[in-house]
Amino acid sequence: MTFNLSEQQEKKYLQQVIGIINDTIQNTDTSVKEHVETLQEYKDYIWSNKDIDPHEIRSMRESILNHFALGESVIDKRRRLGKILDIPYFGRIDFEEKKNGSSVLPIYIGIHTFYDSQSKTNLIYDWRAPISGMFYDYELGKAVYTSPTGEISGDISLKRQYRIRKGKMEYMIESSLTVHDEILQKELSSNADDKMKNIV
């Protein structure tokens, strides 16, 4: 069974992903604020206690540097989240690994990886990740990518491209080929919609 079979289901899923990204952004903003407040407390303490002994200064310096480094990484994460909020992903492949008991894995591909800590899954894979390379290198059918544990082979059963702007899906194309031209993408999408309307 295909995950998010229709365009309507895909649009609903997109809004769910954006909701999770927004929640993560709020948590990240809270974390940034906490780091800033902690650094301000250190600064105030140093200014109000001019006669601190050198040993205490050394340990405080270490804590300040750690907080600063953590704060920088949180700010970097916030910047990445801001980038993926408007356009979370642009492509998808459904891949089933060739081994017993494996199921079809929908792989959404975007400019950055997004890991959902609640469900403990990657909702979006970075386009440079080895698994994402199959989107560019293969059509439907047999496919292979190299993971840290070795070569993984299987089958691609679905390939889609999306046009998402400001968190809204403008259209999607289901195709065995990767179409890069934007005008052609839009035309293919509207033709596919017309065909579906005629069938229904």
Sequence positions of predicted segments:
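Extended, charged low-complexity regulatory segments
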Residues: 1-198
